[in-house]
Swiss-Prot record:
<feature type="domain" description="Helicase C-terminal">
    <location>
        <begin position="230"/>
        <end position="391"/>
    </location>
</feature>
<dbReference type="InterPro" id="IPR014014">
    <property type="entry name" value="RNA_helicase_DEAD_Q_motif"/>
</dbReference>
<dbReference type="InterPro" id="IPR001650">
    <property type="entry name" value="Helicase_C-like"/>
</dbReference>
<keyword id="KW-0347">Helicase</keyword>
<keyword id="KW-0067">ATP-binding</keyword>
<dbReference type="Pfam" id="PF00270">
    <property type="entry name" value="DEAD"/>
</dbReference>
<dbReference type="GO" id="GO:0016887">
    <property type="term" value="F:ATP hydrolysis activity"/>
</dbReference>
<comment type="function">
    <text>ATP-dependent RNA helicase which is a subunit of the eIF4F complex involved in cap recognition and is required for mRNA binding to ribosome. In the current model of translation initiation, eIF4A unwinds RNA secondary structures in the 5'-UTR of mRNAs which is necessary to allow efficient binding of the small ribosomal subunit, and subsequent scanning for the initiator codon.</text>
</comment>
<keyword id="KW-0648">Protein biosynthesis</keyword>
<dbReference type="InterPro" id="IPR027417">
    <property type="entry name" value="P-loop_NTPase"/>
</dbReference>
<protein>
    <recommendedName>
        <fullName>Eukaryotic initiation factor 4A-3</fullName>
        <ecNumber>3.6.4.13</ecNumber>
    </recommendedName>
</protein>
<feature type="domain" description="Helicase ATP-binding">
    <location>
        <begin position="49"/>
        <end position="219"/>
    </location>
</feature>
<dbReference type="InterPro" id="IPR014001">
    <property type="entry name" value="Helicase_ATP-bd"/>
</dbReference>
<feature type="short sequence motif" description="Q motif">
    <location>
        <begin position="18"/>
        <end position="46"/>
    </location>
</feature>
<keyword id="KW-0694">RNA-binding</keyword>
<dbReference type="GO" id="GO:0003723">
    <property type="term" value="F:RNA binding"/>
</dbReference>
<dbReference type="Pfam" id="PF00271">
    <property type="entry name" value="Helicase_C"/>
</dbReference>
Length: 391
């Protein structure tokens, strides 16, 4: 398998841009990005946004979990002209879920610029697609089969399309979409910008890039930016949900030795836990996606500056942030999917900080915990009594 993977280097001259504000994107789009909960661009966003919004063809080798979907959303929203109701950007994805997720992120990030996007996917009514497309959208995110069908019916008009994005291209090819991708491409205007994103680059992908692209910028983003190395991971078995709170109170003195982040799965749980901790005279701060950006910025600044030591939050925080001085993370709730686990407790290898993660686990969570262990080939042991000495 490995022989057909080329050694892939990032093109010379691709400089990472450390903040969204320096990317030259529209102010209202920047508002949408912050509102969505991003604070700092991920590695792929730092490298790919600028070449794409300046009109270059781009090949990005990146896996899921690198922030590629929001990178796509950001660039598409920057490029389209929302005053025109023509389709200007087309994104093809291998699965309905990914296409729908991409549409959601575009609508969320593009909220203040009033972008219109629609997911053209199998399993939804063709009538709905026709209605939406005739009403006018600037962006279509879809699966190759349905998009091809809509183009052939002349419902999806292609003359205004200036950007084609092929997401998870290797996955599209392995699902047998090659012919449909070529079919769609044939209908698109000749002056087309093409962006291809793929975790692997087999020869079939390189064939697409040589046929569809001119002098592409190459960007390689390894997912190993986040690592569990150097992080001691433990679990505490709690019989009932109510017992988690007592366990947390017992651990509070340990938490405040350093700074700690406590993750809950819902905003309601964050609010509930924060007020319950305060009722019991514990000092904590909290943050989640429903708070106004100003308030979130203030809370983050306090936490970064060390004025507050314990932060209770949802996954909004996990995705876009890198507070390296946090050496203790508590999963009050285990994350809903295993990718989020590394976003919550992983460290970027560059800093190589040591850390401790403690997972509160009810008996019905054991299976999820084992699944996480297996997925990351890591070991999560029962928490020892002297956990304070490890921090």
């Amino acid at each position: 398998m490995e022989e057909d993977r080329l050694v892939f280097e990032t093109s010379k001259g691709v400089e990472p841009i450390a903040s969204f504000a320096e990317m030259g994107i529209k102010d209202d789009l920047l508002r949408g990005v912050y509102q969505y909960g991003f604070e700092k661009p991920s590695a792929i966003q730092q490298r790919a946004v600028l070449p794409i919004i300046s009109g270059r063809d781009v090949i990005a080798q990146a896996q899921s979990g690198t922030g590629k979907t929001s990178m796509i959303a950001l660039t598409v929203c920057q490029i389209v002209d929302t005053k025109s109701s023509e389709v200007q950007a087309l994104i093809l994805s291998p699965t309905r879920e990914l296409a729908a997720q991409t549409e959601k992120v575009i609508l969320a990030i593009g909220d203040y610029i009033n972008v219109q996007a629609h997911a053209c996917i199998g399993g939804k009514s063709v009538g709905e697609d026709i209605r939406k497309l005739e009403h006018g959208v600037q962006v279509v995110s879809g699966t190759p089969g349905r998009v091809c069908d809509m183009i052939k019916r002349r419902t999806l008009r292609t003359r205004g399309i200036k950007l084609l994005i092929l997401d998870e291209s290797d996955e599209m090819l392995s699902r047998g979409f090659k012919d449909q991708i070529y079919d769609v491409y044939r209908y698109l205007p000749p002056e087309l910008q093409v962006v291809l994103i793929s975790a692997t680059l087999p020869n079939e992908i390189l064939e697409i890039t040589s046929k569809f692209m001119t002098d592409p910028v190459r960007i390689l983003v390894k997912r190993d930016e986040l690592t569990l190395e150097g992080i001691k991971q433990f679990f505490v078995a709690v019989e009932k949900e109510e017992w988690k709170f007592d366990t947390l109170c017992d651990l509070y003195d340990t938490l405040t030795i350093t700074q700690a982040v406590i993750f809950c799965n819902t905003k309601r749980k964050v609010d509930w836990l924060t007020s319950k901790m305060r009722e019991n005279n514990f000092t904590v701060s909290s943050m989640h996606g429903d708070m106004p950006q100003k308030e979130r910025d203030a809370i983050m600044a306090e936490f970064r500056g060390g004025t507050t030591r314990v932060l209770i939050t949802t996954d909004v925080w996990a995705r876009g942030l890198d507070v390296q001085q946090v050496s203790l993370v508590i999963n009050y709730d285990l994350p809903n999917n295993r990718e989020l686990y590394i976003h919550r407790i992983g460290r970027s290898g560059r800093f190589g900080r040591k850390g401790v993660a403690i997972n509160f686990v009810k008996s019905d969570d054991i299976k999820i915990l084992r699944d996480i262990e297996q997925y990351y080939s890591t070991q999560i042991d029962e928490m020892p009594m002297n956990v304070a000495d490890l921090i």
